[in-house]
C-alpha cells in the first residue's frame, strides 16, 4: 500500500481548523512542524506551544484499487483554505510511523556519554551508553539545553546520591544519573507522555528499579519530606523562577543543582531569583544562546 501526504502551511490560528479538516477527510495521522525555524521559548504549563507558521501534514492511505483523486482533494482543501501554500507527495509502502529512525545517529556528549538510539549498537562499548527511543518525548541530546545538563551531570558526583530530574521529558537526565551510580532518581513532568517515556527509557537501560517517575502532584506525595543531594531541571525560565522556593525545599544544604532551558537574555533574571536560596557558581553557554546555570544550595541552620 502507498501513502499520500498533504502538506499545508498555515498561520497559528488556522492550525486547529486545518487538523480537523484533514481528519474529517480521512487522514490516518496529522503532524505539525515549524515552517520558519522559530524557537519556542516560553509555553505555559499544560499548553502545547505552536509556531507562528505551521506545516500541517495529513497522511492518507492510497488504496491501489480505489485511489484518492489528489486533484479533487486539493481543490476541496484550497476552497476551504484559500491562498495558503499546499503540496502533496506519495510515499512507497513503508512503516512510515517510524521512518524518522533513519535520521538518528549516536551522539557523544562530553567525555562520558553516548546517546544511542535503541536500534543501534554503541560506538564505544565501554562508555556510559544511554539507550533511548527518541520518538517518545522531548530530550534526545540534540537540543543544547539537554546537552548542557548531560555535560554537567558527567562532571558532578552523583554516585550513591538521591537525584531529582524535574521536567524529565524522555527521562534522559535521570537515566544518565542512574547509569553514573545514583542511588535513586525521582523524576517528574507535567506531560503524561513524558512519564511513560521516562519509564520505558529507564527500562531500556536496566535502571527502572531505581527510578520513581510521576506527575507533579504524585511526585510531591512520593518524595516529601525527603531532600535530594542533586537536582537538575531542564524546563524554561518562567517555570524555573516560579519553582525556586520549591526547589530550595527539595534540595539539601550544599546540594548541587543545574537549571537549563534558559536563554542568555534570561540568565540575570533567573539567577537573581535563585540567589536568595542558592549560590550561583557557574553559567555555561552553548550555541543558539541556550545557557545552564549551576551551583549549590545555601547552607541552612
From Swiss-Prot:
GO cellular component: cytosol
GO MF annotations, alphabetized: protein-lysine N-methyltransferase activity
EC number in record: 2.1.1.-
GO biological process, one term: methylation
Keywords, sorted A to Z: Cytoplasm, Methyltransferase, S-adenosyl-L-methionine, Transferase
Subcellular location: Cytoplasm
Protein residues bound to S-adenosyl-L-methionine: 146, 167, 189, 234
Pfam families linked: PrmA
CDD domains noted in UniProt: AdoMet_MTases (cd02440)
Reaction equations catalysed: L-lysyl-[protein] + 3 S-adenosyl-L-methionine = N(6),N(6),N(6)-trimethyl-L-lysyl-[protein] + 3 S-adenosyl-L-homocysteine + 3 H(+)
InterPro entries cross-referenced by the UniProt entry: Ribosomal_L11_MeTrfase_PrmA, Ribosomal_PrmA_MeTrfase, SAM-dependent_MTases_sf
UniProt keyword S-adenosyl-L-methionine, yes or no: yes
Signal peptide from the UniProt entry: none
Enzyme class, spelled out: transferase
Family annotation (Gene3D superfamilies): Vaccinia Virus protein VP39
Superkingdom of the source species: Bacteria
Function per UniProt: Methylates ribosomal protein L11.
Family the entry assigns: Belongs to the methyltransferase superfamily. PrmA family.
Entries under PANTHER family matching the protein: ELECTRON TRANSFER FLAVOPROTEIN BETA SUBUNIT LYSINE METHYLTRANSFERASE
Name of the protein described by the UniProt record: Ribosomal protein L11 methyltransferase
Amino acid at each position: 500500500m502507498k501513502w499520500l501526504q498533504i502538506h499545508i502551511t498555515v498561520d497559528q490560528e488556522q492550525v486547529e481548523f486545518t487538523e480537523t479538516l484533514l481528519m474529517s477527510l480521512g487522514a490516518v495521522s496529522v503532524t505539525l512542524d515549524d515552517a520558519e525555524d522559530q524557537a519556542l521559548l516560553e509555553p505555559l504549563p499544560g499548553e502545547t506551544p505552536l509556531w507562528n507558521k505551521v506545516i500541517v501534514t495529513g497522511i492518507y492511505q492510497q488504496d491501489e484499487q480505489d485511489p484518492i483523486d489528489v486533484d479533487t482533494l486539493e481543490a476541496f482543501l484550497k476552497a476551504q483554505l484559500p491562498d495558503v501554500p499546499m503540496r502533496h507527495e506519495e510515499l512507497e509502502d513503508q512503516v512510515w510511523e517510524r521512518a524518522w529512525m533513519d535520521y538518528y545517529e549516536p551522539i557523544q556528549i562530553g567525555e562520558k556519554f553516548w546517546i544511542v538510539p535503541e536500534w543501534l549498537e554503541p560506538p564505544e562499548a565501554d562508555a556510559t551508553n544511554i539507550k533511548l527511543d527518541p520518538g517518545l518525548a522531548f530530550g534526545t541530546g540534540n537540543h543544547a539545553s539537554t546537552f548542557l545538563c548531560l555535560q554537567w551531570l558527567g562532571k558532578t558526583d552523583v554516585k550513591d546520591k538521591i537525584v531529582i530530574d524535574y521536567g524529565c521529558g524522555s527521562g534522559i537526565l535521570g537515566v544518565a544519573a542512574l547509569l553514573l551510580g545514583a542511588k535513586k532518581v525521582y523524576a517528574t513532568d507535567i506531560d503524561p507522555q513524558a512519564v511513560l517515556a521516562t519509564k520505558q527509557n529507564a527500562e531500556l537501560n536496566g535502571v527502572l528499579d531505581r527510578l520513581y517517575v510521576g506527575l507533579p502532584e504524585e511526585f510531591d506525595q512520593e518524595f516529601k519530606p525527603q531532600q535530594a543531594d542533586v537536582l537538575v531541571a531542564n524546563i524554561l525560565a518562567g517555570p524555573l523562577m516560579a519553582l525556586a522556593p520549591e526547589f530550595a525545599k527539595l534540595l539539601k544544604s550544599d546540594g548541587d543543582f543545574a537549571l537549563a532551558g534558559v536563554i542568555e537574555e534570561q540568565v540575570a533574571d533567573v539567577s537573581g531569583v535563585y540567589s536568595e536560596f542558592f549560590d550561583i557558581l557557574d553559567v555555561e553557554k552553548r550555541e543558539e544562546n541556550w545557557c545552564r546555570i549551576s551551583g549549590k544550595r545555601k547552607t541552612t541552620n
